[in-house]
Amino acid sequence: MHCALMGGSFDPPHNGHLALALAARELLNVECLFLSPSRNPFKGESLLDDVHRIQLVELLAKEVNRTGSGCEVCRWEIEQAAPSYTVELISYLTQSYPTWRFTLILGEDNFHSFHLWKEYQEILRLCHVAVFRRSSEAVVPSLDEAMLVQEGVSFYNFDAPLSSTDIRKQLRAGLPVNGLLPASILRYIEQEGLYR
C-alpha cells in the first residue's frame, strides 16, 4: 500500500490544506493519506489546545473523504509528551506498517530548509518526498533538482496562497473567513468560540 503523510500545525485547517490533500492524493496515486497534527517547537505563537486541533483535523479528513476514502488522522505526533521530529514519525510509521510505502508531502517553504532537519537523510532513506511548490516561484538555484529526484524527491506545481496565521488574525478581528475554511471547520470554530 502507498500512503502519503501530510503534517502540520493545522491551526486551523483551511481550504489550502484541503486542496493540497486532494491534489496529493490524485497526483501521488496513494491509497491512503495520513494527516498528522504536530507540535512544532519552532512556531512562536501558541497553538490551539490538542483536543480542538484533533477535532479540526478530523473534520478536515472527513472533507477529504467526501471525494473518496482513505484519509485519516495520525495522532502519534500530537500524543507525544514533547515535540517530536519528522524522522521519528516516519520511523514509527514504517515500523508499524512495514509493507507500506510512504511519501512525505512538503510545501516548498519547508523544503528550502529540509537539509537542516534532524536526520533528513534518514527521512530520504525511509520514504519518498513530494514537494508542492508555488508555480509562480522559481526553484532555488542552489538546489540540484536532478540530483534530488535521484534521491527520491519529486516536485509538483501547486498554488494555494492561504495562511493559518492570517486566518487566525481575521477570526480574532471578527472579519469574515467565508471561502477560506471548509464549512464544517468554520461551524466548529464558531460553536466552540475559538480564536477570539
From Swiss-Prot:
One of its GO terms (biological process) is NAD biosynthetic process. One of its GO terms (molecular function) is ATP binding. Its EC number is 2.7.7.18. Pathway: Cofactor biosynthesis; NAD(+) biosynthesis; deamido-NAD(+) from nicotinate D-ribonucleotide: step 1/1. The keyword Nucleotide-binding applies. Keywords: ATP-binding, NAD, Nucleotide-binding, Nucleotidyltransferase, Pyridine nucleotide biosynthesis, Transferase. InterPro entries: Cyt_trans-like (IPR004821), NadD/NMNAT (IPR005248), Rossmann-like_a/b/a_fold (IPR014729). Coiled coil: none annotated. The keyword Transferase applies. It catalyses: nicotinate beta-D-ribonucleotide + ATP + H(+) = deamido-NAD(+) + diphosphate. Catalyzes the reversible adenylation of nicotinate mononucleotide (NaMN) to nicotinic acid adenine dinucleotide (NaAD). Belongs to the NadD family. It is an enzyme of class 2 (transferase). This is Probable nicotinate-nucleotide adenylyltransferase. Disulfide bonds: none annotated. It holds the Pfam family CTP_transf_like. SUPFAM superfamilies: Nucleotidylyl transferase (SSF52374). The gene is nadD.
